[in-house]
């Protein structure tokens, strides 16, 4: 699972997801990509599940690039705990994505294989996405 080696602070505010992605919204490495259409938090487990599904489908032929990294800690309080006594402890890591952000890129495979692999990865994501091809 992906997570930062070290961070400056253990806990973060939740923040809000407004606007569209101004960075990481163009294909840079591969020929095909999976692009988000909604704002969301994507957990490191979901990122890994999508990556595994794609690499299993492509086998040795192509190359896959993961363009997002989970750098935001999400805290969870223990079950049946009374209110107060501080914020919960960090439980898992998420990547904050806005509409337009590229999640995965792929190259070195025919379009039909890429489309199939990326659609399987898209089904693992908690949001609407689209398949795009670089010109």
UniProtKB/Swiss-Prot annotation:
One of its GO terms (cellular component) is chloroplast. Pfam families: Ribosomal_L16. It comes from the Eukaryota. It comes from Lepidium virginicum. This is Large ribosomal subunit protein uL16c. It is found in: Plastid, Chloroplast. SUPFAM superfamilies: Ribosomal protein L16p/L10e. InterPro entries: Ribosomal_uL16 (IPR047873), Ribosomal_uL16_bact-type (IPR000114), Ribosomal_uL16_CS (IPR020798), Ribosomal_uL16_dom (IPR016180), Ribosomal_uL16_sf (IPR036920). Belongs to the universal ribosomal protein uL16 family. Keywords: Chloroplast, Plastid, Ribonucleoprotein, Ribosomal protein. GO terms for molecular function: rRNA binding; structural constituent of ribosome. Its main location: plastid.
